[in-house]
Amino acid sequence: MSTEKDYVVADIGLADFGRKEITIAETEMPGLMSCRTEFGQTKPLKGARITGSLHMTIQTAVLIETLVALGAEVRWASCNIFSTQDHAAAAIAASGVPVFAIKGESLEDYWVYTDKIFQWADGGLSNMILDDGGDATMYILLGARAEAGEDVLSHPHSEEEEILFAQIKKRLAASPGWFTKQRDAIKGVTEETTTGVNRLYQLSQKGLLPFPAINVNDSVTKSKFDNKYGCKESLVDGIRRGTDVMMAGKVAVVCGYGDVGKGSAASLSGAGARVKVTEADPICALQAAMDGYEVVLLEDVVSSADIFITTTGNKDVIRIDHMRAMKDMAIVGNIGHFDNEIEVAALRNLKWTNVKPQVDLIEFPKGNRIILLSEGRLLNLGNATGHPSFVMSASFTNQTLAQIELFTKPDQYSNQVYILPKHLDEKVARLHLDKLGVKLTELSEEQAAYIGVSPKGPFKSDHYRY
């Protein structure tokens, strides 16, 4: 492990390898490269000190260097203990950007690194957060509440909360009042994923959101592309790299049929699996049925299916009783943000055999075994390298524009959760059309007037569902 200077990465010697892959990724990320061209001279993020908590991948490296090109100072950590690509982290560290991320880091290190991305060398404070899952935001808000006298650190509900609370207490002791100062310095947060967005909306509804937030996840060019088309390619990639199991002919169960579930079902179906879906929402259940999938109860298929994938963003979706009833060598994995969709903690007292990194064989007393991928964390990033660069370009262009919005227009945003305006959503899409050879039909003035839009867009109302 290298700890020289202001970074922690697995091996700084991997920087050249990482740089070569970053160069390839840049050619597949036209949105971010266009942002550099458009904003590189004016540097709208000059003065921004961005704390970033998002998977430290090659694609994220292109995002980080775009933010820097637009004038920002950046400190970065991964939002998942298994998702870092060590050569990407090394390349970013070698470029001079402080990054704290190692694939397979411990939970203790994860929260230490989350603290480090707020600790600037000159003792200053972050003024922006770029988050994925909400952990960086939660770290600051929980600490500030503790400083205000609230009893928020006494009753951890999981091992991870116990570790998180210990790290907060350590910072409270080392820097009294720091959390409150850091909270008050934040101009805004941009949130990448469904789970983190849900956290922000809950805070907003309770009146506990102390700064503006932009919900990047619900930009159409994020949720309908990253969540769907990204998962469509990366889920099967992760299962294959982890298990080398042939999916054609297998029965696969996808728990949840939101955007991630839709992409996951398509991924498995495209690999030849016979896909069944479980769903609590009647609208999503009807969509699944009309897309040709059998919608079932997990309990009815748990003993016969071969592959189980959770996509819900909820907790305890696959429980210990389900896994106990599975056939021998069933594959169990998750592509939702957190690891609590699968009741992994209840498996800890069983026999675990590590097959290779992020692949474990777990044996039940009756002799049946399951293959657990990435310990129930994001398997597409733990067992593979995540979504392809092109689709991540759309997501990260949204992030870049959202950071510019909140940093440069503080008077236009109050302490609520916002979505990027439609014209910016359409802009993100436009930036990715040339790469695919797409030619847009242009409306005449008469046609545009007939449907009540501008010939240049936006073309849909805010409530339109794509």
UniProtKB/Swiss-Prot annotation:
UniProt-annotated location(s): Cytoplasm
Cofactor note: Binds 1 NAD(+) per subunit.
One BP annotation, GO: L-homocysteine biosynthetic process
Gene3D superfamilies, per database record: Adenosylhomocysteinase-like, NAD(P)-binding Rossmann-like Domain
This protein's pathway: Amino-acid biosynthesis; L-homocysteine biosynthesis; L-homocysteine from S-adenosyl-L-homocysteine: step 1/1
Residues engaged in binding NAD(+): 193-195, 227, 256-261, 279, 314, 335-337, 380
Cofactor(s) for this UniProt protein: NAD(+)
Function: May play a key role in the regulation of the intracellular concentration of adenosylhomocysteine.
Keywords: Cytoplasm, Hydrolase, NAD, One-carbon metabolism
Reaction catalysis annotation: S-adenosyl-L-homocysteine + H2O = L-homocysteine + adenosine
Signal peptide extent: none
Family recorded in the similarity comment: Belongs to the adenosylhomocysteinase family.
SUPFAM superfamilies assigned: Formate/glycerate dehydrogenase catalytic domain-like (SSF52283), NAD(P)-binding Rossmann-fold domains (SSF51735)
GO molecular function: adenosylhomocysteinase activity
UniProt-listed Enzyme Commission number(s): 3.13.2.1
Full protein name: Adenosylhomocysteinase
Gene Ontology CC terms: cytosol
Matching InterPro entries: Adenosylhomocyst_ase-like_sf, Adenosylhomocysteinase-like, Ado_hCys_hydrolase_NAD-bd, NAD(P)-bd_dom_sf, S-Ado-L-homoCys_hydrolase_CS
